């Protein structure tokens, strides 16, 4: 009879500073306590006991906003390289956006993308379905009815790919037929997205909010919904680059002028400060990377929008923690718990008995230099934070009970990640 594989994490600390030990049985967290007796497990070949030496144990990060470039643009990134970059950065589940080639705007394309990710990704994955300017309402209905996805992403401003939707009838159809709509909406398009949310009573997730002015609109709408007891929630996402970078940094040298370009563009330092304030006042729901890699040659040749982000997102937030800008429980809420709750992901996002064992071990004291002291896993091979001194680093990633990343290396023998399940 096959013996279950057991991992025991000893002498850890949780985000509240309490001692924590975790027993993982196969792919499930079986027990969490301050002290797990290991006597019965000693000298058994199917058991791995790891003393994490008081380091931080967290649920794996869930990044609901990535562009893994597969299918169709795989010279920039693919599900294998992108997922390895995730594992290194402490991300155990990513969601991929629909603006690939072909776009994820039909059930067939969605199923093909899921199959590709299932064969190649070393972490768990979800796929956002895409709304189309060619009116794919029938496909949206089909996908949602078959429970192959539970979110629809739309682009209300120009960005990478040909997915801008300007037709009000198509937007109406998408909001009428979806439960949660993710929007790329900038400036006055945020007003339009909020109006659609309020008119059709469906959930709205506003991606990568870059500025004080735009965030104020979302905060106001959230308040109004709460006051009116409305059941159609609005969620606010910010990215690490809109927290840590700004126009001044971009314009500081010729290299940055080319590399630090994305949609929405970087804003002022005062916008950085407002976003941080909003985080600490509980106005932000998630941190999403908007990982959108391009080769450095492309970036330096002409203005190309998008940057890699999954390898540095957690480390940047830990650096902010070490600088007193944010507390550890807030990081866990924004990067693990809230994404799982908003996307209705089954049994992930928390350290909880009976949940999948998506667990990371973090050294909050580790000082390192991004792009210098480590080997980048992303196919694009660069980071916008090169030479930044960071404090705090993921040192172990466990996905579904498998150690996928440890001691600076990807475990090439680990099982592949799973397609996420969501509440039906």
Cite the ranges covered by each PLM segment.
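N-terminal metal-binding scaffold of metallo-dependent hydrolase/deaminase domains
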Residues: 1-43
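Active-site metal-binding motif and surrounding structural segment of the metallo-beta-lactamase
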Residues: 38-58
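Metal-associated gating/positioning segment near the N- to mid-region
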Residues: 55-120
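Histidine-centered catalytic micro-motifs
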Residues: 60-71, 156, 182-185, 289
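A glycine-rich helix N-cap at a beta->alpha junction
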Residues: 115-131
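Histidine/acidic residue-rich metal-binding segments in metalloenzymes
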Residues: 138-287
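His/Asp/Glu-enriched, well-ordered alpha-helical/loop segment
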Residues: 188-192, 198-201, 280-281, 285-287, ...
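C-terminal cap of metal-dependent C-N hydrolases
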Residues: 356-421
């Amino acid at each position: 009879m096959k013996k279950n594989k057991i991992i025991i994490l000893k002498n850890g600390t949780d985000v509240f500073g309490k001692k924590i030990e975790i027993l993982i049985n196969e792919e499930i967290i079986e027990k969490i306590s301050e002290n797990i007796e290991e006597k019965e497990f000693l000298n058994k070949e199917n058991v791995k006991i790891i003393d994490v030496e008081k380091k931080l144990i967290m649920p794996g990060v869930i990044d609901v906003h990535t562009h893994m470039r597969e299918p169709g643009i795989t010279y920039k990134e693919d599900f294998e390289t992108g997922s390895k970059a995730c594992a290194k950065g402490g991300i155990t589940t990513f969601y991929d956006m629909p603006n690939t080639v072909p776009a994820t705007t039909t059930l067939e394309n969605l199923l093909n993308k899921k199959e590709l990710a299932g064969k190649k990704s070393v972490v768990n994955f979800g796929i956002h379905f895409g709304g189309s300017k060619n009116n794919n309402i029938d496909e949206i209905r089909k996908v949602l009815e078959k429970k192959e996805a539970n979110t629809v992403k739309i682009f209300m401003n120009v960005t990478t790919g040909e997915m801008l939707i300007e037709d009000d009838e198509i937007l109406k159809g998408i909001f009428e037929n979806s439960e949660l709509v993710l929007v790329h909406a900038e400036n006055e398009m945020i007003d339009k997205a909020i109006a659609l949310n309020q008119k059709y009573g469906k959930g709205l997730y506003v991606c990568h909010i870059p500025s004080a002015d735009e965030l104020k609109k979302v905060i106001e709408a959230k308040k109004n919904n709460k006051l009116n007891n409305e059941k159609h929630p609005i969620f606010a996402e910010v990215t690490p680059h809109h927290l840590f970078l700004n126009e001044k940094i971009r314009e500081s040298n010729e290299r940055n002028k080319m590399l630090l370009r994305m949609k929405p563009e970087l804003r002022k330092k005062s916008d950085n400060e407002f976003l941080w304030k909003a985080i600490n006042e509980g106005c932000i729901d998630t941190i999403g990377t908007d990982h959108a890699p391009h080769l450095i040659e492309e970036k330096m040749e002409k203005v190309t929008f998008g940057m890699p982000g999954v390898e540095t997102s957690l480390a940047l937030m830990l650096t902010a923690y070490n600088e007193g800008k944010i507390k550890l429980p807030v990081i866990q809420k924004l990067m693990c718990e809230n994404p799982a709750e908003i996307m209705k992901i089954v049994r992930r996002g928390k350290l909880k008995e009976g949940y999948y064992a998506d667990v990371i071990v973090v050294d909050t004291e580790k000082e390192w230099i991004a792009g210098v002291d480590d080997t980048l896993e992303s196919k694009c091979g660069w980071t916008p934070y090169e030479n930044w001194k960071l404090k705090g680093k993921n040192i172990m990633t466990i996905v579904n009970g498998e150690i996928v990343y440890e001691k600076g290396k990807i475990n090439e023998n680990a099982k592949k990640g799973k397609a996420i399940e969501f509440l039906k």
